[in-house]
Amino acid sequence: MNPPIASSELQQLADRIHAGQIILYPTDTVRGIGGDATNIKVIKRIIELKHRSLSKTMICLVHPDWIGRYTSYDVVGSYQKLDQYDVPTTLVVPILLGVLPEEMVREGTIAVRIPWSCDYLMSLLALLGKPLISTSANISGHRTPSRYEDIELSIIRSVDWVAPPSRDTGTHQSSRLIGVDGQVLR
């Protein structure tokens, strides 16, 4: 069991994200690289760090209290229909125009996940009040690391803040991906 994260630690992390820093952190799935999904400089830096194609979208972690600012789609209702809060699930949903940089949007949609099973992330997202980029902590095309020790040194050196290895919380596997039409994509 991981020690709880103090509210002062969460606030410091939220402040780092608001300041445009990139973090390496445990998610409800795998270790992720993230930052402010509304900040174009952060998005471009993450794309560059991962050597990622601009055509590949990134997931945003969101909070149920404010997801309505980004989509008119009933994200919370969709999770309730799935009735599997314990299985990390990413939904591809329509996005409201102009609320996120175009680098985060593909064909009018965005991939979002509410990390129900990860208390610290839910608290962090509530503090942030905006989406957090969540992409695996690897160079695009390389194996997704399941443990902190497997993360490439170039990734660790390229971010502004790294969560301690003792903070690992995830399932160590990618989330399930469900399209707007309910079709399982992954």
Per-segment meaning from a language model:
Residues M1-R186:
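Active-site-adjacent structural elements in enzyme catalytic cores
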